[in-house]
Amino acid sequence: MRVDKFTLALMNRRLVLKTIWERGAINKAEIARRTGLSLPTAIKITDELLDNRIVRSCGRQEGASGKRPEMYEFAGDCYYSVGIDFAPTVLRALVMDLNGMPVAKAKRPIPVPEDADAVIQTAAELIDQLLRESGIPLHRVLGVGVGVPGILDLDQGRVLFSPNFHWEDVALLEPLGRLLLQRTSIRWPMRLENSNRAMALGEQFFGSGVGYHYFICINLGYGIGAAAIENGELCVGASGTSGELGHITVEKDGPLCTCGNNGCLEAVASGRAIAQQARNLISSGVKTRILELAGGNIERVEAKTVFAAAREQDVAALDLVRRAGEYIGIGIASYINLLDPEKIVLADGMSNESLLIGQIQKVVKIRRMRFAGRRVKLRVSNLGEYGTAIGAAAIQLKTLLRQGGLSLTKEQEEAV
């Protein structure tokens, strides 16, 4: 296949920038060696990236004999990105630099998830608050990434269907961008991504997926979802719906799911499902510590209440956790048998519950095929509750690496 000069130049810029980003401090000769480019080409591209202000000099190489070569590094701490996670009950947002270092983060509850206008208004207020608190120059913010559960139109910035929010065909990026423009007088690039895939991006760039070419990130929270990274790229699917692990059927005649199907994994093993099952047990007269730990108010029973009771060896709570872990383990074992990944990363709130994770690991070991997944590593994420927001913010870093450099507005170029 013939490649035109423009495409070849872009490919080479991507290669050099990615090498500098991955390696940290590196000299031009080493860049040429690692990329396979000629030294003159490596020098030319590095100088262009210096002019683009995304690469900078970081001194001379230590320990080198003779004239010590100049070293270069990714200037990730000079630019920032905003990420926001539209979780079903709370908005989590952060401002971070392109090295993944948060400079401000906060969260706000969502009182009425069904009210899209109110949720978007709250999101704009939260982002504006964080930008003000961070004190960073706004012209150094490259854009805003948004993670939302459900089926999305990424090009149009719309939520086609989000069962957790009960949204259908909701415009998201346009009104959010307009509200931010009113508050900050800046129109930033806005990127939309499914929350599971955003979470996987966070793991790929800054978490347990660093250095892995093929891994799966599984979201164990209010809902259940998954996303795969293969050869460094997100697996999206033909219609953008890949990774809906929570909507595989595990009980033919199981409870109704928010998606409209019956017996989905999310309907029997998610945080929301565990809490509802506990309320049903209490209402049926089962004796359990769960209600006491919820302050005697059945409406305050949450998944975390059930896990707290399970840690106290409450029989009913232990049974709920065991049952959820068994279903999730079956789902993960099926993923391993189908896809044979290098690593599986368990993320979000329930991934911190050792009783649940222990049950999942036990079931996965039993249910996976004997020769499938022999090398797969099952690990818990270290990104914490802001993992999806980190991944949403990382969309700007991914875009920068794909473009082979910064793409600044005229106002940004004049201000930098």
Annotate each language-model stretch with its function.
Residues 1-60, 64-140, 181-185, 252-253, ...:
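ATP-binding/phosphotransfer module of carbohydrate and carboxylate kinases, centering on a glycine-rich
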Residues 84, 142-147, 151-276, 391, ...:
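Phosphate-binding/catalytic loop of phosphoryl-transfer enzymes
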